[in-house]
């Protein structure tokens, strides 16, 4: 966009485009209604409310550079080079528009369509909520050759909007300090958490320059992002450590009825599908109509091409969606003037018209691509045919295992020590390494709600295995059968027999490896239970401090374990009998009472819940650590290794 056009349109973005729906009240009383929670998540949500406003300016074509700063005192500054929030008088409030934006709830440039055609956040809604939940917020607006300034305290205006200088730039700078009375859990920002989302925004908004700078003492760093390839660069980033079947991602984009659709995709030699979708920069974790349109088009276009080019014989069945998505990495990004979000976490796009639009736009572009690139097209079809053969083999294996008491719930694995309760909300399944630990766990558990499934040795590394090989593995079959969720296309998280799946392995290298193999299996083939928050890692103690024959205190593993051990030894050194240390290398070294007391008793145990905040990053790490390529793994280990004395 030229400066002349930008200046002309900037004149049209004025107070008349800031609509007021209701006053700013109750935000401080019920902050969770506006930002989800006042935890760490809610704290970081404040940043996105302000950044989204700058992104809206970028989507509208007026901003090209956004900067985010974590200040030394853990306050936040967001700077953009957009048009600047309007500073003229807003008709309904009789106050400057910028003041209205920051002090009136539901005042913003999104409503009515005059300000923004497409919006990620609701411009103004976020601003006023952030203001209400901050001890202090100030805004500098560069507009009409002047710098306009206003300051607020906990949502209230300190002084009228004033001009504090001249400028030849345009844009908005917002600085805010979250209120510790609201955010009682923490007011400390996590650089990595902010950085990941900022990089994601750079991928999703092609050509946008966005940076994040940490100015806190000892943590100083800056990351700059700028991707001319947009979501095609995102696919390359995700597939960085994977073997791909063609070098450059396929990229298509189109617009219909003011709705733009972008798709970037690339096939790897692996077995896992990784499709990520976004609507107006919001990650639609639960999918939606844009994903539906893409999946339908992908399957139809590949089958049509395979038939026309005799790559599928007349007597052969069409490839299924599962077949054509094996090894696929894809990013779908839709920009919609009026998105409707639904689903449990409001991360599912619900607009019905998007199915047809995505389907049509992607079908046309993808069909043309296949015709123009016959070698790549042939590789894609051949990969789908191989996947179909593996699917048929896996189906046969599944039927055989069902007959042999495999995946039917009515025939649970013989080694499963089940619990008596049938209420999944209270039941727990402990996956225990080895028979000896399994014996202690079975004896020590609460039989009412705790079930035990021992596994022998290291399970199959599913990162390197096809579906039929996975289903042939007895330990994996036992886990799926016990959980009751089904497998593959039949997987249904609502059928889970337990809402706590606890990985309980030894605190040594082998135990860590088994845990990693189990997490890889869960991430790749049971991901919905991970997303539902059902997966936990038990934290058995690493030391016991004994006085005579009695264990006085247990020390959990962690960075401070040696300090805690020395403190415990000092506490019990004053008596006649000197304390001794018992080191637990394996769960089998504890008797059933100790295992219950330290690791299984809900009153005293420590467990870590496993979550996936960043699916793309998790996908990269699992592939790097568990996949075929050695070099990326070696580099990762060299960069992240902690050199220490091993107790072996």
Curated annotation (Swiss-Prot):
Heterotetramer, composed of two GyrA and two GyrB chains. In the heterotetramer, GyrA contains the active site tyrosine that forms a transient covalent intermediate with DNA, while GyrB binds cofactors and catalyzes ATP hydrolysis. Binds two Mg(2+) per subunit. The magnesium ions form salt bridges with both the protein and the DNA. Can also accept other divalent metal cations, such as Mn(2+) or Ca(2+). Its EC number is 5.6.2.2. It is found in: Cytoplasm. InterPro entries: DNA_gyrase_B_C, GyrB, HATPase_C_sf, Ribosomal_Su5_D2-typ_SF, Ribsml_uS5_D2-typ_fold_subgr, Topo_IIA, Topo_IIA-like_dom_sf, Topo_IIA_B. This is DNA gyrase subunit B. The keyword Isomerase applies. Mg(2+) 1 binds at residues 433, 506. The gene is gyrB. NCBIfam families: gyrB, PRK05644.1, PRK14939.1. Its main location: cytoplasm. One of its GO terms (cellular component) is chromosome. It comes from Streptococcus pneumoniae (strain ATCC BAA-255 / R6).
